[in-house]
Amino acid sequence: MIVFPFLLFQMLSTEVEGGLFDFNATLPLMALQFIILTTILNFIFYKPVTNVLDERDEYIRNSLTTASASLVKADELTKTYEQQLAESRKKAQDIIKVAQEQAQQIVSVKIKDAQAYGEKLVSEAFHQLSIQKEDALKTLEMQVDTLSDLIKSKLLND
């Protein structure tokens, strides 16, 4: 029987409810509950999450800044070392060129000395041969003289 008085009360009531757009005390209460819930969720969940995300973003930015600074420094060092390497190669090539020129000069001096020594030996040998030739001619002339004297004496004695 409790249902009957309730239904009767409903029928006698002249007030029509607005349904979804009923502007009574529940709407501001629901709005207040939503704002309070949003504020509580903001402090409990969203603030720590945003703090973590901000810290992560700052860490990533710092890491990127450090990495780009390191990359710039590495590029500078690479350029410096490549320049030093190029200079060292050029110096090494210059040293090799100078050493080759010096070696060529030493070789040419040695060749000239060897040629001079060879010419000296040839000259001395020629001189020795000339002396021996003259000695041989003198000896031969003396032998010819003695033989001719001998022949002459044999011819005259006979």
UniProtKB/Swiss-Prot annotation:
Q: Which UniProt keyword terms apply here?
A: ATP synthesis, CF(0), Chloroplast, Hydrogen ion transport, Ion transport, Membrane, Plastid, Thylakoid, Transmembrane, Transmembrane helix, Transport
Q: Which membrane topology describes this protein?
A: Single-pass membrane protein
List the CDD domains hit by this protein, alphabetically. ATP-synt_Fo_b
> Recorded GO terms, molecular function?
proton-transporting ATP synthase activity, rotational mechanism; proton-transporting ATPase activity, rotational mechanism
According to its UniProt record, where is this protein mainly located?
Answer: plastid
Please name the Gene3D superfamilies in this protein's record: F1F0 ATP synthase subunit B, membrane domain
Compartment(s) where it occurs, according to its Swiss-Prot or TrEMBL record: Plastid, Chloroplast thylakoid membrane
| Keyword hit for Thylakoid | yes
Per the UniProt entry, the signal peptide is none
Superkingdom of source: Eukaryota
Q: Which GO terms describe its cellular component?
A: chloroplast thylakoid membrane; proton-transporting ATP synthase complex
Q: Tell me if Methyltransferase is a UniProt keyword of this record.
A: no
- From the record, give the transmembrane residue ranges: 25-45
InterPro entries tied to this protein = ATP_synth_b (IPR034679), ATP_synth_B-like_membr_sf (IPR028987), ATP_synth_b/b'su_bac/chlpt (IPR002146), ATP_synthase_B_chain (IPR050059)
- Please state which protein family the record places this protein in: Belongs to the ATPase B chain family.
Q: Which NCBIfam families match?
A: PRK07353.1
Function in brief: F(1)F(0) ATP synthase produces ATP from ADP in the presence of a proton or sodium gradient. F-type ATPases consist of two structural domains, F(1) containing the extramembraneous catalytic core and F(0) containing the membrane proton channel, linked together by a central stalk and a peripheral stalk. During catalysis, ATP synthesis in the catalytic domain of F(1) is coupled via a rotary mechanism of the central stalk subunits to proton translocation. Component of the F(0) channel, it forms part of the peripheral stalk, linking F(1) to F(0). The b'-subunit is a diverged and duplicated form of b found in plants and photosynthetic bacteria.
Q: How does the annotation summarize its subunit structure?
A: F-type ATPases have 2 components, F(1) - the catalytic core - and F(0) - the membrane proton channel. F(1) has five subunits: alpha(3), beta(3), gamma(1), delta(1), epsilon(1). F(0) has four main subunits: a(1), b(1), b'(1) and c(10-14). The alpha and beta chains form an alternating ring which encloses part of the gamma chain. F(1) is attached to F(0) by a central stalk formed by the gamma and epsilon chains, while a peripheral stalk is formed by the delta, b and b' chains.
Note in the entry: In plastids the F-type ATPase is also known as CF(1)CF(0).
Kindly give the HAMAP family that the UniProt entry links to this protein: ATP_synth_b_bprime, ATP_synth_bprime
Q: What is this protein called?
A: ATP synthase subunit b', chloroplastic
